[in-house]
Amino acid sequence: SLLFSSNCKYRSTETTGPAQQRLEFRQGFFGIYDALWNAINLRNDLQHFQDGLFIWDIPTFSEEAIREAILNAVSHRDYRSAGSVFVRQYPRKLEIVSPGGLPQGITPENILWHQYPRNRRIAEAFARCGLVERSGQGMNRIYEECIRTNKPKPDFRGTDAYNVNLTLSGEVQDPQFLRFLEKVGRERLKSFSTKDFLIVDFAYRGRPIPGDLKERVPFLIEEGVIEKIGRDKYTLSRQFFQ
């Protein structure tokens, strides 16, 4: 059994002082994986949005993204360090800090395209147990879920040679984008790759599409999801805003 040491704290504000709740887990990981999520979910507020007759509630913390982030912290941490994995929850964001910096050659900029599992056997065990669909794809799923729920992409500020600091914001940025994705359709979104989601996000924000993503642009144009509006400029398709 994989032994796991974690501290989970909840703070209602970011000011210094004692946490409102603090839980410590020091046992086999499979025995506390659900308990850790359940503790987070106790303070997982729903954000309510309405646009005409269109009404929906979005959890502040996506279960899929949070679970993937925990699995990443456990499978990629440096076990030569005696430190624990820390989970710090605030009303609108969650931080996960794991011992050991990013593996050699991995940066926040290339983390989606360069997989280097520090503990391959743990990652493979998670895949065999069905906790992850495919070893090495956890961060991709986190990015996709952040875009799908219109929340800021993962933030690695505070990461250094000794710790990986991952912050996931729970703040929904634009309900109109959520409605756009709803009209695109869940079945269609299931066929999207990580690159497809990133392109849609760049088009939504009016930013140039990076060169390493452009190979997927024709597919999204053919699907009617984005439109070209100038040289190297794209926008979300107008048909889904009507």
State each model region's role:
Residues 1-242:
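C-terminal regulatory or interaction extensions
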